Amino acid sequence: MTDVRFRIIGTGAYVPERIVSNDEVGAPAGVDDDWITRKTGIRQRRWAADDQATSDLATAAGRAALKAAGITPEQLTVIAVATSTPDRPQPPTAAYVQHHLGATGTAAFDVNAVCSGTVFALSSVAGTLVYRGGYALVIGADLYSRILNPADRKTVVLFGDGAGAMVLGPTSTGTGPIVRRVALHTFGGLTDLIRVPAGGSRQPLDTDGLDAGLQYFAMDGREVRRFVTEHLPQLIKGFLHEAGVDAADISHFVPHQANGVMLDEVFGELHLPRATMHRTVETYGNTGAASIPITMDAAVRAGSFRPGELVLLAGFGGGMAASFALIEW
């Protein structure tokens, strides 16, 4: 757990134009709108156009966040892109984003902590801000529609594409929400619960792998749900205890938008009596690392956060991993 202490001075988001209904995504998987809604709470999602890549989504969200922050790309010190669906295995997607934004001279790197990635990226830029100053652009962006098996009802109904972004600056930059504390956790013994089996150095993707569908995202949904419902509430309670914050002090809860039904279960176990849980899963689905910053940006634009309120971000996903951030608005 780390005290980080910098401000969020702007947020932004981007989702593709194409709306994909439950009936459209469910038909090849043999399920209908009613089944998907009951199991996930998701009613629709957005999928990228054929000519869009993850960096395109990330760039659009980054531009929106920079505009909200009132700074130019040239003022950035570092860009961190959290993604598990990069444009290519190499180079980093963040390099494309840097170029598209015109952020010449800015350091740029990727973070792959799957759906926990944005808070991991947020923590990763803290050192750069301390030692070099300036501003950081943190983006969560994923394009899962390209790695889904259309016949796998356990996964294809869950995911949408999108990107969300935050501009961070030192606490000396006037007023605005302060990131007070972050915590990162990884449970490497559970790596097989969420995976894309082939395409890396352990198992290069060949014709046999393609025939077997090993290029697709795969998940042990039952065990993932067990991990989340059993571990996440306790990890969050420990995080708040170490931060010296009572559960009743939390005004807003912004979790990773994995599955609407599962979010209700987790929120019920947390016992945050005054907190509002913010959601976008019904309209955007699970957007991977993008889900927290997309949901946070929606709340910012709705005027949901008030000065002095505490906001809790909670990421969880492949690794297995979990990540938390405490923000004082």
From Swiss-Prot:
Source organism, top-level taxon: Bacteria
EC top class named in words: transferase
Biochemical pathway: Metabolic intermediate biosynthesis; (R)-mevalonate biosynthesis
Subcellular location: Cytoplasm
BP-aspect Gene Ontology terms: fatty acid biosynthetic process; isopentenyl diphosphate biosynthetic process, mevalonate pathway; secondary metabolite biosynthetic process
Catalytic machinery residues: 115, 256, 286
Transferase found in the keyword field: yes
EC number(s) per entry: 2.3.1.194
MF-aspect GO terms: 3-oxoacyl-[acyl-carrier-protein] synthase activity; acyltransferase activity, transferring groups other than amino-acyl groups
SUPFAM superfamilies: Thiolase-like
Alphabetized Pfam families for the sequence: ACP_syn_III, ACP_syn_III_C
PANTHER family: 3-OXOACYL-[ACYL-CARRIER-PROTEIN] SYNTHASE 3 (PTHR34069), BETA-KETOACYL-[ACYL-CARRIER-PROTEIN] SYNTHASE III (PTHR34069:SF2)
Main function: Catalyzes the condensation of acetyl-CoA and malonyl-CoA to form acetoacetyl-CoA and CoA. Does not accept malonyl-[acyl-carrier-protein] as a substrate. Can also convert malonyl-CoA into acetyl-CoA via decarboxylation of malonyl-CoA.
Quaternary context: Homodimer.
Name this protein carries in UniProt: Acetoacetyl CoA synthase NphT7
Gene that encodes the chain: nphT7
